[in-house]
Amino acid sequence: MYEESQDLLQKNTMEFIHDGIKYQWNEEECNYSVLPNDYRGEITIPAFIHNAPVVRLATDAFFDCAELTAITLPETLEEIGHSAFEACRQLKEIYIPDSVRQIGLDAFSDCTSLQRIRLPKSIHELPISMCEDCTALTEVILPEYVKVIESAFQGCTSLKQITLPEGLEELGWCAFNGCKSLQKIILPTTLRRLNNFAFSNCEQLRSIVIPEGVEYIPMGCFHGCTHLSDLVLPSTVVDINVDALNYTAWMKQQDDGLVYYNDLLFTWKGSNLPNNGHLTVREGTRIICDQALQQCRDLRSIILPNSIHRIGQEAFSCTYLQHIVMPDGLREIHSGAFMCCPHLQSITIPASVCEIGVDLFTGCEQLQHIEVHPDNPYYDSRNDCNAIIRKKDNCLVAGCCNTQIPEDVKIIGESAFMDQHTSKHLVLPQSLTKIERCAFCLCEDLEEIIFPESLTTVCDGAFDDTAWWEKQSAGAVYINNILYKYKPHVHSGECEPHCFVREGTTQIASCAFEDLTKPLYVILPAHTVEVHKNACAYAEEHVKILTQEEWRAIKP
């Protein structure tokens, strides 16, 4: 059945076939790997050949061996490569010896007859798609020391129950996605993290208890678990993704309106808002979860109780929101909390707030008044500047169209003025040393900027899509002694074949040459220039940064 030749059976031969099994000799390690071949029927892999151990199944070793029915693995085996048994559709059972320390991606995926698998004790992580689409799999014996399960059992439609060992810390993306027969799963007390779609489309799952220590119920975690009605979340959970429980029996049981789990407000159910776009959050609510009210596009005003201490990311991306009063006791306002609220006009930050994220007012085109309570120890709006300034580093975190940047500000924070109406003329203070990424991005009115000599760092995207940027000539654009960005010719999108960095330049900024699609040589001056590690982001194959000596050696 197999090609075989005794003269190939020599220890110093790199590849040979013996008893129908193809091997590769590893001279450096003095061991053998099993290579792909046309394997059929029952296979037994020996522990030793010529007194050297067989330690590895190579990538694709038994890939698509449709007539392989059984295999015996040796106790010397240490590694099972990527897709080693993928699409072995007649293989019903496999015993993996405890000597195996590593299993590759897709190792047993699409083994549609595989019913039982026992995994070795030495495995600490079950890899992506390890048993994906093993539609006959009913029994899995997991090692007691496994810490992470990736999308290992996605699409195992016959799996009805599984015991996860104590010590498990994380379930990865789609870990049990599409396990349509899964009825029971007990999560260990050591579990700390669930990832997106971990249990999505487990249609027969009726109840689940998430252990203490888990803080986040992620996107699509239980999406499509149509029979899931009994859900117990721990007190440690601080956020539930807005899509985590879509198409579950639990969600179906909830009334239209604001949807809560204990003291978390995590989404809105229904189509129309009552009371002309006004909502009141119930007393006792501690957290407004990420994106919780994004679907309330017609929301115009909302009353928050003083029990609220955290507002999540992009919680109020509400097109018509005009009025909101931040409650006393609020401590955290996370990134983008009011992103894309173009009708919001005024906001006051309470004294209790100690953490504010980036992108806070991106797209708030009509925001005119920002005030921080004078007793706040972490932030202020000094000199009625209409901005939020972090005291510890004098960073302007968020501004609006009426902001007057104070003279002692040292940093303009990430996305501080992004997508807002600003004046055409901007004079930055003499104290300023850094402008963070996207600080003025999409400020289309901004035409002229006076940069102070103190400015030493300008991050990527700081002035993208502004009138100032549009006015810059093609080629290298400088801000003080910083090469901020290289601008291709507007119509052709092309650049000159080389760019000589001007004398006196101290820094080439992050993403200075990003996305260039034509070859460009960048020649540095004789003195030292700090080149950001991401200066050529997404253009590494086209942009070459050279010293003058390197340029002289290759120039045409």
Feature annotation, model-predicted:
Residues 59-61, 82-84, 104-107, 127-130, ...:
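Consensus positions within tandem repeat domains that build extended binding/scaffold surfaces
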